[in-house]
Amino acid sequence: MIKWLCLFFSYILMVSSHSWLGLWLSMEMNSLSFIPIMIEESKENSLKYFLIQSVASVIFLASILNQSFSFLIPFALLIKIGAAPFHMWLVSISKSMSWKVLSLLMTFQKIGPLLGLAMLQFTNSFFIFISAFIGGLGGINQSNLRLIMAFSSVSHLSWLMVNMSSFFLMLVYYVTYLAILYFAVILLQQSGMYSLAQMNSNASLIYKASISFNLLSLAGLPPFLGFFIKWMSLEMNILSPLLVLALVVSSCFSVYFYFSIAMSSLLFPSEVKSKKMEIPGILSMGFNIFLPLFFL
């Protein structure tokens, strides 16, 4: 219970930090609170996470204390957040995590680094480009749903970086991504699904449709909510044509892959009929279909 309280308090400190040193202290508190939660599931994953976060923290602290190394601040934050090309640690530990811990890692654990990048208004085209393509291509031919979500997280980081020039746009994108992801995670956790093979046999039609809608929304397929926040990002930011093309193409890769998953799962006959599983499924479908009306 104490570790969860410390974790929650660290998020409050991150949001209320007004200096680099304050942000560093809150991120350290956050990491030290999150590691005990990871240890309960895997000591190996917690060790990997500790080492990566420690290296990034040392770089970050050295950068803010010595102006000669200030150019390293965004690199330290990108390592912490798992953006490409520093994403391999995130992929490595994601494949054996529970849905609860993985969802925290892909959402709330990114608050500190995202705030730091927003303070810098970091919109480097190279990192946006490489995160978009690795995130889009990485999920292809993966059968582990946790790995698919991890690569999806890398892809969405590219869109978050696109919106770094406006804190409001970044916040809207982040909150929307968080909501879509958590709907998907709730459904997957209830059924105990961890692989694509399980999607073909262990759920009712409504359940499979709802998880498919969430995946397609994460990929950015119209008319789901995920499409509208990506469209908003392109409309509200001044981007080079090449970068826009890269973002659109990477989203197309994701849509193609997720659409094939959705079709293969929905075409299989349903055997399980559980109202407990159908209620959140119906809610998530309504969320993804009707909320986009506010963007019109």
From Swiss-Prot:
The chain crosses the membrane at residues 5-25, 49-69, 71-91, 114-134, 167-187, 209-229, 242-262, 276-296. It is an enzyme of class 7 (translocase). Pfam families: Proton_antipo_M (PF00361). It is found in: Mitochondrion inner membrane. GO terms for cellular component: mitochondrial inner membrane. Its EC number is 7.1.1.2. One of its GO terms (biological process) is mitochondrial electron transport, NADH to ubiquinone. Keywords: Electron transport, Membrane, Mitochondrion, Mitochondrion inner membrane, NAD, Respiratory chain, Translocase, Transmembrane, Transmembrane helix, Transport, Ubiquinone. It catalyses: a ubiquinone + NADH + 5 H(+)(in) = a ubiquinol + NAD(+) + 4 H(+)(out). It is a multi-pass membrane protein. One of its GO terms (molecular function) is NADH dehydrogenase (ubiquinone) activity. Belongs to the complex I subunit 2 family. Core subunit of the mitochondrial membrane respiratory chain NADH dehydrogenase (Complex I) that is believed to belong to the minimal assembly required for catalysis. Complex I functions in the transfer of electrons from NADH to the respiratory chain. The immediate electron acceptor for the enzyme is believed to be ubiquinone. This is NADH-ubiquinone oxidoreductase chain 2. It comes from Artemia franciscana (Brine shrimp). The lineage of its organism: Eukaryota, Metazoa, Ecdysozoa, Arthropoda, Crustacea. The gene is ND2.
